[in-house]
């Protein structure tokens, strides 16, 4: 959206040598561009009788960083004694930057009950114990190696007719399987 209804404030008197501060807050909506390098520009104008008009611009830039969320599911349900259990971690990146190896992302969990015969994959690729993750079969603590989990940035698309932006998050899937 390049224009919007004008927000007008009237009736403010500023004495000679004085000042006034006007503060307002606006929420970013679905028309705001979110991809890397995007910005929102706000223009303000002061005018009135006997003064020279003043114009000022303020630019707010879209954050360029990963924005990760994680959900965890378990299967099968119900879990059977001495059976195999699978934890699936769906990691989504709604941000405009990749969560790359330099980001140092780790996923950790304490499995209770403790799992034995543990295996793990990330996006279908087997993870190597001791290299890609650590697992303590006594405590149930599982931790991926920093930077092993990478999640691509979201893809932002704007509807040419409505101007509404859609966010398609980058996705990574960690699957941990073991015996209880």
Predicted regions and their residues:
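Exported/extracytosolic protein signature
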Residues: 1-180
């Amino acid at each position: 959206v390049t224009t919007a209804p004008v927000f007008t404030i009237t009736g403010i008197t500023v004495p000679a040598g004085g000042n006034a501060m006007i503060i307002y807050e606006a929420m970013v909506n679905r028309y705001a561009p979110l991809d890397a390098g995007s910005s929102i520009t706000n223009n303000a104008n002061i005018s009135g009788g006997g003064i020279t008009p003043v114009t000022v611009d303020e630019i707010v830039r879209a954050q360029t960083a990963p924005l990760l969320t994680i959900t965890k599911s378990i299967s099968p349900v119900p879990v059977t004694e001495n059976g195999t259990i699978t934890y699936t971690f769906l990691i989504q990146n709604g941000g405009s930057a990749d969560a790359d190896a330099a980001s140092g992302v780790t996923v950790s969990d304490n499995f209770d009950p403790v799992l034995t015969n543990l295996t793990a994959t990330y996006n279908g690729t087997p993870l190597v114990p001791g290299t890609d993750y650590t697992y303590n079969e006594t405590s149930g603590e599982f931790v991926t190696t920093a930077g092993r989990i990478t999640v691509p940035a979201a893809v932002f698309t704007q509807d040419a007719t409505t101007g509404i932006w859609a966010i398609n998050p980058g996705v990574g899937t960690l699957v941990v399987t073991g015996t209880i």
